[in-house]
UniProtKB/Swiss-Prot annotation:
Keyword flag Oxidoreductase: yes
EC class name: oxidoreductase
Official protein name in the record: Elongation factor P lysine hydroxylase
Catalysed transformations (reactions): N(6)-((3R)-3,6-diaminohexanoyl)-L-lysyl-[protein] + NADPH + O2 + H(+) = N(6)-((3R)-3,6-diaminohexanoyl)-5-hydroxy-L-lysyl-[protein] + NADP(+) + H2O
Lineage, top ranks: Bacteria, Pseudomonadati, Pseudomonadota, Gammaproteobacteria, Pasteurellales
UniProt keyword Oxidoreductase present: yes
Molecular functions per Gene Ontology: monooxygenase activity
Role of this protein: Is involved in the final hydroxylation step of the post-translational modification of translation elongation factor P (EF-P) on 'Lys-34'. Acts after beta-lysylation of 'Lys-34' by EpmA and EpmB. EpmC adds an oxygen atom to the C5 position of 'Lys-34' and does not modify the added beta-lysine.
Organism, scientific name: Haemophilus influenzae (strain ATCC 51907 / DSM 11121 / KW20 / Rd)
Keywords: Monooxygenase, Oxidoreductase
Record family assignment: Belongs to the EpmC family.
InterPro entries found in the cross-reference section: EpmC
Enzyme Commission number(s): 1.14.13.-
């Protein structure tokens, strides 16, 4: 199955451009979310380096962000670049569990391979297994309780486009493979 950037951009924009004034945009080296302003009249999710996986990851952050956070650059997240200590890495991972669980669900809906991201290439991520397990536990919660409205809208659109199974089947989520 081929995953084209034009497709994920079109799917996202069809789902959310009108109601949320938000577009998915191929960006440069670093991803960023910028709310609408005087120069750009729409909210923009810029994903990095033309990677499909980056698009899914940045979308997941947008899906987690509430209405007020979507008014802030990068949703008001603190970000500490690569080279984080193991302790700071654990703090980083706490805010990544829900977005990465959604990213995994969306990737599965698109028939795309998901890999958990410690996003700390120049630092010591330490043992990432507890983080991966936490992401899996959040997937289980979403499977049981349902996805937030915007996430479910996009999941359904991906399922329709890629002709994948229309449910969150936990048998397709193997924490040892991420």
């Amino acid at each position: 199955m081929e995953h084209k950037l034009e497709d994920i951009i079109a799917i996202f924009n069809q789902c959310f451009e009108e109601e949320y004034n938000t577009r998915l945009v191929k960006g440069g080296d670093e991803p960023i979310y910028l709310p609408a302003n005087d120069e750009v009249p729409y909210n923009a999710i810029y994903f990095a380096r033309g990677f499909y996986s980056s698009a899914l990851h940045e979308i997941a952050h947008w899906l987690v962000a509430g209405k007020e956070r979507r008014k802030l650059e990068d949703f008001g997240y603190w970000y500490e670049p690569d080279g984080r200590s193991e302790e700071r890495q654990r703090d980083f991972e706490k805010v990544e569990v829900k977005p990465q669980a959604l990213e995994w669900i969306l990737a599965t809906a698109a028939g795309f391979r998901y890999f958990a991201s410690a996003d700390n290439l120049n630092g010591n991520p330490g043992d990432t297994q507890p983080f991966k397990q936490a992401v899996y536990e959040q997937v289980k919660i979403y499977a049981e309780k349902g996805l937030p409205k915007r996430a479910e809208t996009l999941r359904k659109a991906l399922v329709a486009f890629y002709s994948t199974e229309d449910d969150i089947n936990l048998a397709k989520f193997d924490v040892t493979c991420i």
